[in-house]
Amino acid sequence: MIARLRIAAAIALSVTAVAIGGAFAQSSTVDEIAKYREALQDGNPAELWEARGEEMWTTPRGPKRVSFATCDLGLGPGVVKGAYAALPRYFADAKSVMDLETRLVWCMVNQQGISEGDATKIKFGDGSARRSDLEALAAYVTSQSRGVEMKVPVSEPHVRDMYRLGEQMFFYRGGTHDFSCATCHGEDGKRIRLQDLPNLTKTEGAQKAYTTWPAYRVSQGELRTFQWRLNDCFRQQRFPDLVFGSEASIALTTYLAGRANGAPYNGPAIKR
């Protein structure tokens, strides 16, 4: 009997300790995850994608044997320094607002002579030998804006219209779960498991989130672009697949990129 009472007392004390420490444990775990990510930054595998993307940028490709030196990302043909920090933007030659990936595809098709099907055949790598040229190019181009202030030209009429459409989409509820982007990213203090969910309706949250994509995902062994991030959000909301390079994807990207204006770009980053 005494032995049983001792066991019961020990269990009661353990439960009490868990109850008292639970609030601290969650906070502590989040802090440790942040430290883990910070420690990994010095050896970010995204650099491998950046190196491959740089080689692709300077190498003549496609039927026309042309390099990306002729590709204008908004600051002049071949200029990559700071270009990503001002995307999406309106391109008169394409008569549309484009983000980085859609502009890269446009240059492949119109300047290098690559078919759109081949240019977009592998949009995202799968963690094996199936590698995406777009992800590598995006890694290189975005790395050249590291430390540059975000300045998406949201006052330009075409970009402004796309921004407003993206804002409407951000708050639009639908799908089998009646979710919107704001369901997960419209309030402070939300998380999925141990993952903090930034409040993208606030400037600080939007800046912190957008400026760290593309990112190397440790759990997947792949560099992921912002287009991939949007696709994965749609999947989790049980929405239909987001069409690559569609007006919907450009609109959402424009809205979120515009909300990040004023912050220094800090990617490609590393995430869980």
Regions from the PLM with identified roles:
Residues A25-L48, T58-A136, R146-G147, Y172-R272:
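Electron-transfer interface patches adjacent to heme c in soluble/periplasmic c-type cytochromes
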Residues E38-E55, V148-E167:
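Short, charged low-complexity linear segments at domain edges
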Residues M1-I11:
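Bacterial N-terminal signal peptides that target proteins for export
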Residues A8, S155-E156, P268-R272:
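Short alpha-helical "patches" and their helix-cap loops
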Residues L137-Q144, P153-V154:
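Hydrophobic, well-structured mid-protein blocks that either form specific transmembrane helices
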Residues E135, A139, R160, R164-Q168, ...:
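Internal, well-ordered alpha-helical scaffold/interface segments
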